[in-house]
Swiss-Prot record:
Gene3D superfamilies: 3.30.230.10, 3.40.50.670, Histidine kinase-like ATPase, C-terminal domain. This is DNA topoisomerase 4 subunit B. Belongs to the type II topoisomerase family. ParE type 1 subfamily. It comes from Caulobacter vibrioides (strain ATCC 19089 / CIP 103742 / CB 15). The record marks K508, N511, H563, R678 as: Interaction with DNA. The keyword Magnesium applies. It catalyses: ATP-dependent breakage, passage and rejoining of double-stranded DNA. Residues 36-46 have a biased composition (Pro residues). Mg(2+) 1 binds at E483, D556. CDD domains: HATPase_GyrB-like, TopoII_Trans_DNA_gyrase. Pfam families: DNA_gyraseB, DNA_gyraseB_C, HATPase_c, Toprim. GO terms for cellular component: chromosome. Mg(2+) 2 binds at D556, D558.
């Protein structure tokens, strides 16, 4: 499994801590100064919205301040559902955690009141309240709470390690809250400022003298954004607070909740403090389970200077962890990285090399067959790194891409793991035998699948347009579903013939959500797809019949391509939901643009990515920009480099949420037989849609 195909967090609802930008303590925002252009007489301004079909200045909407956040909350917190709601808490909590990690706070208090207000209080330095030099008449606190990208985490002077650029998070929480009350104890006084829906209700006030230090943010999410009756879940808040305490052993987090808000077994009061950090976390997670070694491999290394710190805990169990054989939960600067990244790669490499070296030392020749997947297959692992200036892949910050993190983690764990193995030969031998057994089982499964796949291929009447892969193993085999012969031709040239098969589909894909059973049965394209997969639909689906490990939908990076992908996902959801639950369905992410200047070229997946490249990689330059009209336009080498090469591509795994009823409702609304449901959905969700829509 490639790093880009990683399964999301397996730690239950604790993955609600998934990161989005977070909140500051020193504002440093440089207003952009544009050069003064030569005056050009403007045309008469439009005073009213233009007529249908026309496009004028009246159609241009300028969103100022925090209005973009309220208009498009999904861009900042990933939606407006329960998970997104709890992101607000994660943002505020991350700010206080950064104060603790920096050594300025020891205690954090989390409180959910009867009126639905949630407060997070710390005993850190307190947000700065002095006037901001770049914003006359505004305090630094007001800038922090009302200006996107204002924060004290850019220069590294206020924080060496932080969970993100928290000026984004504080202002986003403010924008999406009905009311926010920020109390700061600093400079000998208690200060208070109140906000509503992103706007201050008045200037900052000096309430009373006080010797205390710290910050308290008390807020209530806005029903206009999240819907009536959407409230914080005490159980989820409790788990999130407890997880943060595990991640930094130097902090104490106090939890309290009004009893009227609790409808389960969540304690109304609790104090979280874990002196052993992740080792305590793992002990709680593995309570009652039989482990291969009596003690887990756990530790913490701090490196002076630029490197940072790493903490880890790992154990192995023969029975697995509930629905999963194993899990790996990772964090960077206390923020979850559910998609993994370089710190996980270093962790896996250190364990694998250490165990193989131990096998060689003991003369165990079977140790050569061990892979990293064998080592972590039935392991419960936790890893947390603290590094300066972390780099993440994508805007969601769920995958760490800092290359130094891999080297740092691997180097830090190498000697401690060797020492742990050598200090208890009996336990080390038990672990080695256990991992070798996993490796031998893996090789046996591969051999059985090769025989099974070869036998199934001989029995099946595969569609003639399928360009099948040459290999007989199911593991690693991939089926790319592409649109039309043109794209299919490019894909066939770009593929790895041993592992990658290509199935071009012609014509419009049938919408199975609105089609009758007879139409579905008679549809040749979908029949060919079923034949290629080898598995049957509905209750007759058997995963062992599936001829490929990954089914990858590869369509053009435009609206038409997205429509075809939606139809195919609907097909799999309605006819083979177990294929999705098994983690076999993926979306390829081909680029939409190619930017080139001199000898350098970059690919952009969408307009936002293109603008980002223009502002960074090609800043001050005028690159040649080409737009791909379709996959068939791309050279085979380009398609391979950007979309099909497992070492370079990015895949999006299609998953189903825990509560699948919402998915069924959405599929029926958008893809079903009732156009009035689609029309109502568009009316409620497409705020800027003013043009005629083809329903």
């Amino acid at each position: 499994m490639s790093s880009s195909d990683k399964i999301p967090s397996l730690f239950g609802d604790d993955d609600a801590l998934a990161p989005v930008p977070a909140a500051p303590f020193k504002a440093s925002v440089e207003p952009r100064v544009e050069p003064t252009p030569r005056p050009i007489p403007p045309p008469p301004p439009s005073k009213t919205a233009s007529a249908p079909g026309e496009y004028s200045a009246a159609d241009i909407e300028v969103l100022e301040g925090l209005e973009p956040v309220r208009k498009r909350p999904g861009m900042y917190i990933g939606g407006t559902d329960e998970r997104a709601l709890h992101h607000l808490f994660a943002e505020v909590l991350d700010n206080s955690m950064d104060e603790a990690v920096a050594g300025f706070a020891k205690t954090i208090e989390v409180k959910l009141d009867a009126d639905g207000f949630l407060s997070v209080k710390d005993d850190g330095r307190g947000m700065p309240v002095d006037p901001h030099p770049k914003y006359p008449g505004k305090s630094a606190l007001e800038v922090i709470m009302t200006v996107l990208h204002a924060g004290g985490k850019f220069t590294g002077k206020a924080y060496e390690t932080s969970g993100g650029l928290h000026g984004v998070g504080a202002s986003v929480v403010n924008a999406l809250s009905e009311r926010v009350e920020v109390t700061v104890w600093r400079d000998g006084f208690e200060h208070l400022q109140v906000f509503s829906r992103g706007k201050p209700l008045g200037p900052i006030q000096q309430v009373a003298p006080s010797k205390k230090k710290g910050t308290m943010v008390r807020f209530k999410p806005d029903d206009e954004i999240f819907g009536e009756g959407t409230n914080f879940k005490p159980a989820r808040l409790y788990r999130m607070a407890r997880s943060k305490a595990y991640l930094f052993r130097g902090v104490q987090i106090k939890w309290s909740c009004d009893p009227s808000r609790i409808h389960d077994q969540t304690p109304p009061e609790a104090t979280f403090h874990f002196p052993n950090g992740l080792a305590d976390f793992l002990a709680e997670r593995t309570k009652g389970l039989t482990t291969i070694t009596p003690e887990s491999f756990a530790g913490r290394i701090e490196r002076q200077g630029e490197a940072g710190a790493v903490e880890w805990a790992v154990t192995w169990t023969p029975q697995g962890f509930g629905e999963h054989d194993g899990f790996m939960q990772s964090y960077c600067n206390t923020v979850p990285t559910p998609e993994g990244g370089t710190h996980e790669s270093g962790f896996r490499a250190a364990l694998t090399r250490g165990l193989k070296a131990y096998a060689e030392l003991k003369g165990e020749k079977r140790g050569t067959i061990i892979t990293a997947d064998d080592v972590v297959a039935q392991a419960g692992a936790l890893i947390s790194v603290f590094i300066k200036n972390p780099e993440f892949q994508g805007q969601t910050k769920e995958k760490l891409s800092t290359s130094e993190a891999q080297r740092f983690v691997e180097a830090s764990l190498r000697d401690p793991f060797d020492l742990w193995l050598s200090s208890s030969p009996k336990n080390a031998q038990a672990l080695l035998e256990f991992v070798i057994e996993r490796a031998e089982e893996r090789l046996k499964r591969r051999k059985d699948k090769e025989v099974s796949r070869a036998s199934a291929t001989r029995k099946l009447r595969l569609p003639g347009k399928l360009a099948d892969c040459a290999g007989s193993a199911v593991d690693g085999a991939e089926l790319f579903i592409v649109e039309g012969d043109s794209a299919g031709g490019s894909a066939k040239q770009a593929r790895d013939r041993k592992y990658q098969a290509i199935l071009p589909l012609r014509g419009k894909i049938l919408n199975v959500a609105s089609a009758s059973g007879e139409k579905f049965t008679a549809n040749k394209e979908l029949s060919d797809l079923m034949l290629a997969l080898g598995a049957q639909a509905g209750a007759k689906y058997r995963e062992e019949d599936l001829r490929y490990e990954r089914i990858i939908i590869m369509t053009d990076a435009d609206v038409d391509g997205a429509h075809i992908a939606s139809l195919l996902i609907t097909f799999f959801y309605r006819t083979m939901p177990e294929l999705i639950r098994g983690g076999h369905l993926f979306l390829a992410l081909p680029p939409l643009y190619r930017l080139a200047h001199g000898g350098k070229s970059e690919y952009a997946r969408d307009d936002a990515h293109k603008e980002e490249l223009l502002a960074t990689v090609f800043k001050g330059k005028k690159p040649e920009i080409g737009r791909f009209k379709g996959l068939g336009e791309m050279m085979a080498s380009q398609l391979k480099e950007t979309t099909m090469d497992p070492k370079k591509r990015t895949l999006a795994r299609v998953t189903l949420p825990r509560h699948e009823e919402s998915v069924e409702d959405l599929v029926e609304t958008l893809m079903g037989r009732k156009p009035e449901l689609r029309f109502r959905f568009i009316q409620e969700n497409a705020e800027f849609a003013s043009a005629d829509l083809d329903l």
